[in-house]
Structures are given as structure tokens and as C-alpha cells.
From Swiss-Prot:
Record family assignment: Belongs to the RecX family.
Record gene name: recX
Protein name in UniProt: Regulatory protein RecX
Native source species: Leuconostoc citreum (strain KM20)
Biological role stated in the UniProt entry: Modulates RecA activity.
Location(s), subcellular: Cytoplasm
């Protein structure tokens, strides 16, 4: 048996140093101090000391988790990883998660629901990107499905249309076909299905008028014509023509652009 000879407040708020038989033995959280009624003069056996230290380890891990939760919602996996980074034993992690779950501080379904709502309203993303992020956060598939069920097809199309409108502004110098392809790919990259992306882009009136399409073809042709300026004339001609086809311009526009360039060099 050992006797508590001194209890002192540590610099860290809510922490106390315990001396047994005039020697520092361990530190405890205030909650542990109160739980075990630790006071000067009390005697402790080894089993009780072990239990006190174990409960204090839980208290410290709980503080780590609560501080982490203070900044944002977290999943069970994320909180466990945070404790693991702080070298918290797995059995203590389990104890902390159980307490947090009971208190309602950890709820993976609530996290998933909130995440989907945020990605619809604040930082728009499609369901595929959202699903991947939730999977990486450790949310169970059934919870992901339940959360994504609130993301209706009409909402997806509405959000995708707004994103596509912004994308369209960045591709004004492309051919209509390439512009559409890049918009579809942009929406897919944002997490929308190819079918949804194609449907949205097809529903938008983004065709360049004839003059814009002609100017775009001429502009692209000039760049390519300059790039291949050291090639032989025929090889240069076919390289530029092939590149313009790949960029989605029609043969009529390509021929007109190349004819104009050849005439300028005469």
C-alpha cells in the first residue's frame, strides 16, 4: 500500500500531480481525481493505481478527441486516426468512441448527411466524388446510400448546369464539339455520372455562331501553323489539318483556315 502525500495542480488546466510516499507517481485529470476521491492521506494498492492510470489514459484520449471535434464534425475513423497519431492504445480508443457515441458527439450518419448537404449548397460536387470522400472518411456504405438518397436527380442536374455554365466560359475559343466534350469531362471530374453530364450539356445552347467558330478555327490554325513552321510544306499542312480535326472543327472550316494561311504566306 502507498499513501498520497501531496496533490499539486499542474500547469496544464485540469491536470494534477499525485505524490505517493513523497515521490511523484503519476498525473491525473480532474475528472479522475474526483471519481476516485483522491486526497492527501489516502492509501492506494497497486491494482487501484493501475485502474486510476488506465482511467486517466481514457480521460487524456477523450480530451484529444474533443479538441479534434471542436473544429468540425468527424467520423469514427477520423477520430480513431487522430488518437492513433497521438499513440493512444486501441482499447482506449474504443472506450473513447463508445463515450462519444453515447453522448451524441460522434454520429457517422449525421456526418454523411451534413457532408452531402454541404456539397450541394456550398462547394458543389457530384455524387461520385461525394461517395469517394465519405468512403475515405470511413462511413459505412449503407449510411452513404442513405445520405446520397437526399441528393435528387433534379438537384444534380440543376447544380451540374450551374457548373457547366462556368466551364463554358473558359472554353469559348474551342470548337463547339471540343467545348462540349471538355464540359462533359469537367462535370465528370466534379463527380457527376457521364450520363448526367451529357444530358446537362446537351440541354444547354452553347453552339458557337458561324463567325465565332470560323475565328476559333483560324486562331487555332495560326498557332499550329507557327508550331510546325520548320516542317516541310506538305507535312506541315497535314499536321495542322490533323490537329484541327482533333480539336473538333469541320473540314470546311479547316480548309478555309488553311487556305487563308497559305495565301498570307504568298
Amino acid at each position: 500500500m502507498k499513501t498520497i502525500t501531496k496533490i499539486a495542480i499542474q500547469k496544464r488546466a485540469g491536470r494534477y500531480s499525485i505524490e505517493l510516499d513523497n515521490q511523484f507517481a503519476f498525473g491525473v485529470a480532474e475528472s479522475v481525481l474526483i471519481k476516485y476521491g483522491l486526497a492527501k492521506g489516502r492509501t492506494l494498492d497497486e491494482d487501484l493505481i493501475t485502474q486510476i492510470k488506465y482511467d486517466d489514459a481514457i480521460a487524456k484520449a477523450l480530451t484529444i478527441a474533443l479538441n479534434y471535434l471542436g473544429h468540425a464534425l468527424r467520423t469514427t475513423k477520423q477520430i480513431k486516426q487522430k488518437m492513433r497519431d497521438k499513440a493512444v492504445d486501441e482499447d482506449i480508443q474504443a472506450q473513447v468512441i463508445a463515450q462519444l457515441t453515447q453522448l451524441g458527439y460522434v454520429d457517422d450518419q449525421n456526418y454523411a448527411n451534413h457532408y452531402v448537404a454541404t456539397k450541394k449548397l456550398i462547394t458543389p460536387k457530384g455524387p461520385h466524388v461525394i461517395r469517394l470522400a465519405l468512403q475515405q472518411a470511413g462511413v459505412a456504405e449503407n449510411m452513404i446510400e442513405q445520405a446520397l438518397a437526399t441528393y435528387t436527380f433534379d438537384e444534380q442536374c440543376s447544380i451540374a448546369t450551374k457548373i457547366a455554365e462556368k466551364l463554358a466560359q473558359g472554353y469559348q475559343r474551342e470548337s463547339t464539339r471540343l467545348r462540349q466534350q471538355k464540359m462533359v469531362q469537367g462535370l465528370v471530374n466534379k463527380g457527376f455520372s457521364f450520363e448526367t453530364a451529357q444530358l446537362v450539356v446537351d440541354s444547354m445552347n452553347i453552339d458557337n455562331n458561324a463567325e465565332d467558330e470560323q475565328n476559333n478555327a483560324k486562331r487555332q490554325a495560326e498557332k499550329l501553323w507557327h508550331r510546325y513552321r520548320h516542317d516541310e510544306s506538305q507535312q506541315r499542312f497535314y499536321k495542322v489539318k490533323r490537329q484541327l480535326y482533333a480539336k473538333g472543327f469541320t473540314s470546311e472550316l479547316i480548309d478555309a483556315a488553311l487556305l487563308s494561311l497559305e495565301q498570307e504566306e504568298v
